[in-house]
């Protein structure tokens, strides 16, 4: 139920937006009379007005939107309605436009994309999967090209990496890019691993529109995009520790808070571990690897559920997105947790790889100069949008009144009773010819009900978020007479269900939802599958005390729940009190789930701050190195002086043998100078002597180069090698640190403080190590030339 104040604030926002809509309508009347050539010419004119400073994007908006609107009609046969203009204005302002299913978000986005692309900077439409990005791009590309702009799909389905690099540069030179959040995130990470200026391809992240914005920057905000590197030293403890954990008893050996994904050993558990593994002190420095593996095994055993968080498929652990129900093939849990789950399932443990580069979606989109989003369920996440991203949500009115009937929840004692009643209702609906869409929380449940319906001679389509393109087609057909579709919550999302001939008279699409989801936004999205653009329809959610939401999140008194559960069926059927009580339990459990989700995202955001700041600083330094074009004229003495001062200050006693050893290890393999004249008690004298050796080695290296051009390449490569090797170690260390600190202190505020303190210390160590490796690399790296005359650098 909407609060009166919410409605008033939204109406005030709409009031100011409608003034702009009125100006767009005035311009729309004007441009209708333009010839095609005159309308196309406006794009050139707009660019010139922006370049000259006569106009800004804001002042151009009414006229530019009118031009894009008229072009849409001439090219696509679609004329954006006023509700779409409202959404388009909200998107340009960098906020969240709530637009209901079927209101034309794809067409709405074309206007702010066109306007912002006029600036010549990077403009992006980001959606959740390749199919939707490709579908929307192919539908809208003719419009942009007709208007004189270039548009491209942000990815190529070609395995050849060298081809992809060249193609990427071509893709990102276009005015408008249609891509996915995952593709863009990985491109950002790959771009910042480039070893030359020519290897970079990603332009400025200027303006972006995120489709299904709540799914991407709220539900998936914590999801890290990870590029893996070399294998870590593999632990052989996974299976052994799993056997130990199997002997432990909850509340005796360990304590667990499933709602917070927290688990830890109690004193008896610590004693049991010390006895089992024959260690004197489990928390000694020598036993930290063992403690880490025990914590991983506990989490894998009790906090990750098969067929809920993951399932075993073709000998692999395939993760499941709890919010969306979608499978995540190729995605792995970090810091050894994936391997612990493999051990739990009795599988061969895969190699745990180090992390080369990582970023969360939350921080990826904060890199944009401006971004906005579209969703049908923005209002329910408004406070979080504002707290995390400073975005307000504006609810655009629907073009036609919503006719869908959202029926009250149907309440049952047990899941078996619920399932019987639900199947009975589905059979009755199917007999009338109404199309039915049954939505389940898990793929396992969807497969079960699909089989049951087949056994009852009700043919059905099963959609469990495996084949996006195929499922989009199937979900689009779910509105035909007699259609029966069984799906998980995310299957076919982004595709409208249009009613077939005669279905409207039958009452439209009936959406049956097997249980409340962990988030009320998802419930609302599922109801919204029916009743698009004023169509009739209905939705109903079936609930019981056995539901996952209740078992996982309910904080109700267990005895009270058992008392409700034990009531006989006759009393239940006559008990409104029972219905109200169960609804209260479910609603409260869902609220707890949502609150924990918000807290988890806030916690993840806090942890991410250190690595985000460090990543920005490191990538800035990489870019400075890539911009070096006059290495021959650069003076690297200041860098070397810093490094040599570190060396002399770190040594307690400077001796001749130690200084000579340092020179061999860091400056020159051929050093043979007599050092008798050096006063090793004078640190500054040692620094001066080392600087002399550094300059001699640098001059020798320069002499070995064929040209200043190759010397420039040499300096860039050896410096990048120093930065990357140290940064890779730091990223991997921070991933391990986060897992360790969070586990040790159960996610409390002191865990965050501890993490940031250690992260800062390690960053300072890393910056010193980068300088040291730069000096070592520039002195001791060698350059040779292959048969084609191309330089090959050999690092020390």
UniProtKB/Swiss-Prot annotation:
GO biological process, one term: intracellular protein transmembrane transport
Gene Ontology MF terms in the entry: ATP binding; protein-exporting ATPase activity
Membrane topology: Peripheral membrane protein
rRNA processing found in the keyword field: no
Entry keyword set: ATP-binding, Cell membrane, Cytoplasm, Membrane, Nucleotide-binding, Protein transport, Translocase, Translocation, Transport
Catalytic reactions of this protein: ATP + H2O + cellular proteinSide 1 = ADP + phosphate + cellular proteinSide 2
Entry's localization field: Cell membrane; Cytoplasm
UniProt-listed NCBIfam families: PRK09200.1, secA2
Entry protein name: Protein translocase subunit SecA 2
Annotated source species: Staphylococcus aureus (strain Mu3 / ATCC 700698)
Lineage: Bacteria, Bacillati, Bacillota, Bacilli, Bacillales
């Amino acid at each position: 139920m909407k609060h009166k104040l919410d409605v008033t604030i939204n109406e005030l926002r709409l009031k100011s937006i409608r003034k702009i809509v009125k100006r767009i309508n005035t311009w729309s009347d004007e441009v209708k009379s333009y010839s095609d050539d005159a309308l196309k010419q406006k794009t050139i004119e707009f660019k010139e007005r922006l370049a000259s400073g006569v106009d800004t994007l804001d002042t151009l908006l009414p006229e530019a939107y009118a031009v894009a609107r008229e072009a849409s009609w001439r090219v696509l046969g679609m004329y954006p309605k006023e509700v779409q203009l409202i959404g388009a204005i909200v998107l340009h302002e960098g906020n969240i436009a709530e637009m209901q299913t079927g209101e034309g978000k794809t067409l709405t986005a074309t206007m702010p994309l066109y306007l912002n692309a006029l600036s010549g900077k990077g403009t992006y439409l980001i959606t959740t999967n390749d199919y939707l990005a490709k579908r929307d791009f192919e539908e809208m590309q003719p419009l942009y090209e007709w208007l004189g702009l270039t548009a491209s799909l942000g990815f190529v389905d070609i395995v050849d990496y060298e081809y992809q690099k060249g193609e990427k540069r071509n893709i990102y030179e276009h005015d408008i890019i249609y891509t996915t959040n995952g593709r863009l995130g990985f491109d950002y990470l790959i771009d910042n691993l480039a070893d030359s200026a020519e290897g970079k391809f990603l332009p400025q992240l200027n303006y972006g529109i995120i489709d299904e914005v709540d799914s991407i920057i709220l539900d998936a905000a914590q999801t890290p995009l990870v590029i893996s590197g070399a294998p870590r030293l593999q632990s052989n403890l996974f299976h052994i520790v799993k056997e130990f954990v199997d002997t432990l008893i909850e509340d005796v050996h360990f304590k667990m808070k499933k709602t917070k994904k927290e688990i830890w050993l109690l004193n008896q558990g610590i004693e049991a571990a010390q006895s089992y593994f024959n260690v004197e002190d489990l928390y000694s420095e020598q036993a930290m690897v063992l403690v880490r593996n025990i914590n991983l095994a506990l989490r894998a055993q009790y906090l990750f559920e098969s067929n809920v968080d993951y399932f075993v498929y073709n000998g692999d652990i395939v993760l499941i997105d709890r919010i969306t129900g979608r499978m995540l093939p190729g995605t792995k849990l970090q810091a050894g947790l994936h391997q612990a789950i493999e051990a739990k399932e009795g599988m061969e443990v895969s190699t745990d790889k180090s992390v080369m580069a990582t970023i969360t979606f939350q921080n990826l989109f904060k890199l944009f100069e401006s971004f906005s989003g579209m969703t049908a369920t923005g209002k329910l996440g408004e406070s979080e949008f504002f707290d995390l991203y400073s975005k307000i949500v504006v609810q655009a009115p629907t073009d036609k009144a919503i006719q869908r009937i959202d029926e009250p929840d149907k309440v049952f004692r047990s899941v078996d009773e619920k399932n019987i009643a639900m199947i009975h209702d589905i059979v009755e609906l199917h007999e009338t010819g109404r199309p039915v869409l049954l939505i389940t929380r898990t793929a396992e449940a969807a497969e079960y009900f699909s089989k049951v319906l087949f056994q009852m001679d009700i043919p059905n389509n099963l959609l469990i978020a495996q084949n996006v393109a195929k499922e989009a087609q199937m979900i689009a057909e779910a509105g035909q007479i007699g259609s029966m579709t069984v799906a998980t919550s995310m299957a076919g999302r982004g595709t409208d269900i249009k009613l077939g001939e005669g279905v409207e008279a039958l009452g439209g699409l009936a959406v049956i939802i097997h249980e409340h989801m962990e988030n009320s936004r998802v419930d609302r999205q599922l109801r919204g599958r029916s009743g698009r653009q004023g169509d009739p329809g209905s939705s109903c959610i079936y609930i019981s005390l056995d539901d996952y939401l209740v078992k996982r999140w309910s904080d109700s008194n267990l005895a009270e729940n058992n008392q409700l559960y034990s009531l006989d069926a006759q009393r239940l059927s006559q008990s409104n009190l029972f219905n109200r009580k169960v609804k209260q339990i479910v609603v409260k459990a869902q609220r707890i789930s949502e609150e924990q989700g918000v807290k988890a995202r806030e916690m993840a955001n806090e942890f991410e701050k250190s690595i985000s700041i460090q990543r920005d600083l490191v990538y800035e330094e990489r870019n400075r190195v890539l911009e070096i074009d006059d290495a021959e004229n650069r003076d690297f003495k200041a860098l070397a002086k810093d490094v040599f001062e570190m060396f002399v200050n770190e040594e307690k006693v400077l001796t001749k043998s130690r200084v000579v050893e340092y020179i061999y290890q860091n400056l020159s393999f051929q050093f043979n100078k007599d050092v008798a004249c050096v006063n090793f008690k004078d640190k500054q004298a040692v620094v001066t002597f080392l600087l002399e050796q550094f300059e001699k080695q640098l001059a020798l290296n320069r002499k070995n180069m064929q040209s200043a051009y190759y010397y420039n390449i040499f300096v860039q490569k050896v410096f990048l090698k120093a930065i990357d090797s140290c940064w890779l170690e730091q990223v991997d260390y921070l991933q391990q640190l986060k897992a360790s600190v969070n586990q040790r202190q159960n996610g409390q505020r002191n865990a965050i403080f501890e993490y940031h303190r250690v992260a800062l210390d390690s960053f300072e160590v890393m910056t010193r190590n980068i300088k040291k490796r730069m000096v070592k690399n520039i002195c001791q790296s060698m350059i040779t030339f292959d048969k084609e005359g191309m330089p090959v650098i050999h690092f020390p």
